[in-house]
Design a protein with these regions (language model features):
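Amphipathic, hydrophobic secondary-structure cores in small proteins
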Residues: 25-71
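Cationic, low-complexity basic patches in intrinsically disordered or flexible, solvent-exposed regions
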Residues: 3
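N-terminal first-folded block
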Residues: 6-37
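Intrinsic-disorder/low-complexity, polar/charged segments enriched in Ser/Thr/Lys/Arg/Asp/Glu/Gln
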Residues: 12-14, 41-45, 77-79
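Core SAM-dependent methyltransferase catalytic element
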Residues: 79-86
Length: 86
């Protein structure tokens, strides 16, 4: 399956960051740290339970240049897939 952004979930491995239970601003801060450790164009999947993270990750991706490929919510768990800028 390929999204309209061109992301093919089978083609690239994701680094997973679990921030469930953490409140603002910790999910975003942990994601920033994780992205800093990744190579350009690497994928980071973040799981969070803080509802404020929806806004935080959308704004962060626009301001930082990292691409937000997915933003989903299921049973109170938010999932974000970020692609580190090249």
């Amino acid at each position: 399956m390929q999204s309209e952004s061109g992301y093919n979930p089978v083609a690239m491995e994701e680094t997973v960051l679990d921030t469930k239970g953490l409140t603002c601003p910790m999910p975003l801060l942990k994601a920033k740290q994780a992205l800093n450790a990744l190579a350009p164009a690497a994928l980071l999947r973040v799981y969070a339970t803080d509802p404020g993270s929806v806004r935080d990750f959308a704004v962060f991706s626009r301001q930082s240049g990292h691409e937000l490929l997915e933003s989903n919510e299921q049973d109170g768990v938010f999932s974000y897939l970020l692609k580190k800028k090249s």
